[in-house]
């Protein structure tokens, strides 16, 4: 998402936040999921996180305004926002609970867990492992993906999608996207998991869009 090149809001992404746990038995994860859903439906009248992000890009004046709205507005459920502006110092990750927030402007990677571990929160896992993965395995899943991004030393200009390696690339990957708001560039490529394969393969050619093409 982008408003304009000079002083625009920039671009953003959403990651699913960790799971609030009341139990620590893998077999009881469905109970925690259901309990969280009931709590949200019965008690929360706040805006859903994805609706808030859309509101930001429709109304925010600039990056600073967008950042403040994402930090301060109560949300219906926890979420992790990545926000990047059009200037070199405009970048942050905002970890949100329903009314709380933690913003960092370094360690700019995110998966599906808080950067700093908190009691009674568990990194998200794929649905097929919901009854079997241990608490430690759930933590490791997000940690490895973050480490894969941190260790990449490539270039946006020269190494398009070079960062998409295991564990960032995983069985659930279906689309990969690169965005540069400063130059109004968006790239995307689609993936599919073939029968008998552990990891998906690209099934589309990389698509590159610029602001001029998107407006046209």
Language-model segments: residues:
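C-terminal, well-structured catalytic/ligand-binding subdomain of enzymes
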Residues: 1-216
């Amino acid at each position: 998402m982008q408003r304009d090149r000079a002083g625009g809001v920039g671009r953003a992404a959403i990651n699913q936040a960790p799971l609030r746990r009341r139990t620590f038995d893998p077999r009881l994860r469905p109970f925690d999921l259901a309990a969280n859903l009931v709590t949200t439906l019965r008690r929360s009248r706040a805006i859903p996180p994805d609706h808030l992000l859309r509101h930001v890009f429709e109304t925010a004046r600039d990056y600073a305004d967008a950042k403040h709205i994402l930090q301060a507005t109560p949300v219906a459920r926890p979420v992790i926002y990545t926000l990047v502006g059009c200037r070199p110092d405009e970048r942050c990750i905002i970890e949100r609970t329903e009314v709380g927030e933690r913003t960092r402007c370094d360690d700019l990677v995110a998966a599906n867990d808080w950067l700093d571990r908190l009691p009674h929160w568990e990194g998200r896992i794929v649905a097929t492992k919901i009854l079997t993965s241990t608490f430690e395995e759930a933590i490791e899943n997000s940690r490895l993906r973050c480490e894969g991004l941190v260790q990449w030393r490539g270039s946006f200009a020269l190494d398009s999608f070079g960062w998409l390696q295991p564990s960032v690339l995983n069985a659930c990957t279906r689309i990969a996207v690169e965005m540069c708001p400063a130059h109004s560039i968006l790239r995307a490529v689609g993936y599919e998991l073939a029968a008998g394969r552990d990891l998906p393969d690209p099934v589309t050619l990389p698509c590159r869009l610029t602001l001029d093409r998107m407006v046209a």
